[in-house]
Amino acid sequence: MRTSRLKKPIVLLTIALLSSVFFFAFFFLNKSDVSSTSALRNRDSMARTFILWLHGLGDSGPANEPIKTLFRSQEFRNTKWLFPSAPPNPVSCNYGAVMPSWFDIPELPLTAGSPKDESSLLKAVKNVHAIIDKEIAGGINPENVYICGFSQGGALTLASVLLYPKTIGGGAVFSGWIPFNSSITNQFTEDAKKTPILWSHGIDDKTVLFEAGQAALPFLQQAGVTCEFKAYPGLGHSISNEELQYLESWLKQRMQSSSSSS
């Protein structure tokens, strides 16, 4: 039964990774990053906003760093970005091959009914929470903390936001899925439910099927979580410039709101 779903996992992963690499390479080459290392360090020391970006399966943090060069509005002037890399782990959907992975994925493509591996997921969530706790301890207001992620990183973003005991600025999920069973919703605190979620998904996604993302909206609404769901026709398992432009405006709106209330 699983065999039919695992016919072409390596091909699917290759397509996902190539789409990510081509996207970031294109924008990195077309947008110069004028910030020096010393300037970035000064920015981090004065940061009042923290954005954590979680990459997809088989990818790395450094490969995604060029994304921050697209966010040039003054609202991001005092923003600290962090792009961690997942540790190497055997991945079931790739026949146990070891690759950068936040948690195990039993099968590809992912559908609304795909099995979950909550054990490895919760370990990854603890690591994300440790990163967030460190930033808050360093002086960042929880409402100025944002988690964003693509694919597997998007699924981890969702779990990390909803299982965090405090309200944070927001969580942005790109081409993700619900990585846990409905029974885990009793662990969502009332404060966690107040964190807004932005969910973006390509209708033509063949790796994390659109139905997997679409199923999130009623699930989150029933749990009492506010979620804005945006569908992108013609988009496969990748992030588009249109999605990132909307993410920028979505973040700016919340940053401005947080600034006016503080």
Curated annotation (Swiss-Prot):
Annotated keywords: Fatty acid metabolism, Hydrolase, Lipid metabolism
Keyword flag Hydrolase: yes
Enzyme class at the top of the EC tree: hydrolase
A Pfam entry, by short name: Abhydrolase_2
Record EC number: 3.1.1.-
Active site residues of this protein: 151, 205, 237
Xref: SUPFAM superfamilies: alpha/beta-Hydrolases
GO biological process: fatty acid metabolic process
Molecular function GO terms recorded: hydrolase activity
GO cellular component annotations of the record: plasma membrane
UniProt similarity note: Belongs to the AB hydrolase superfamily. AB hydrolase 2 family.
Protein role: Carboxylesterase.
Protein name: Probable carboxylesterase SOBER1-like
